Amino acid sequence: NGSREALFALAQTVIDASTAGATVVCPNPFYQIYEGAALLAGAGTAFANSDARRNFAADWSQIDEATWARTQLLYVCSPGNPTGAVMPLAEWRALFELSERHGFVIASDECYSEIYFGAEPPLGALQAARALGRERFERPVAFSSLSKRSNVPGMRSGFVAGDAAILKSFLLYRTYHGSAMSPVVQAASIAAWGDEAHVQA
């Protein structure tokens, strides 16, 4: 179904609430499902506020090292919602290095990946990982949806890609809570995902 379900389910999959101080880091402003998913998974939240000097991009430097050490999940959104700020490769590198040091999962909300102002499309988490030689994709998980790409928010069609071990656990969790898509929605989704012309129009 749509990426909102997946963004929520990932937190339930990867958060270990028995760990003292389990934390989810989010950009601010943020899509409300990030905080809801964190709280229902039993984690606390920390927020990286937007920096007006950088087109309102999240300022990850506001998160101190002690908080990063407790972090189990980081939500990022590039292009940002509602700011439109895009994360450059250097910012991805810094977050990957933090993830490697502290072991947290990066949930990359890429629903707006095809709505941008510049000439070049923004880097997604997996593209950035590959560009940095991190082709095993350890800890990043990317989310996308047809609702923005194809202007079909009622269709509830999205996908998840990334770290294979995390996705194995994610799919097991989804077995118990997810709902199947109807054949009609599946067929329409395949057609929409397979067509670029309507996205560029």
Model-based region annotation:
Residues 28, 47-51:
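Short beta->alpha connector loops at strand-helix junctions that form conserved
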Residues 139-201:
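PLP-dependent aminotransferase class I/II
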Residues 3-7, 30-35:
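Conserved coil-to-alpha-helix start sites within the AMP-binding
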Residues 50-121:
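Active-site phosphate-binding strand-loop segment of PLP-dependent enzymes
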Residues 22, 43, 101-105, 136-138:
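A short helix->loop->beta-strand "cap" motif at the edges of active sites that frequently abuts
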Residues 14, 24, 34-38:
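Short hydrophobic alpha-helical segments of the AMP-binding
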Residues 1-23:
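Phosphate-binding glycine-rich loop
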Residues 34, 95, 125:
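Aromatic/hydrophobic pocket-lining residues that form π-stacking "cages" and hydrophobic walls in ligand
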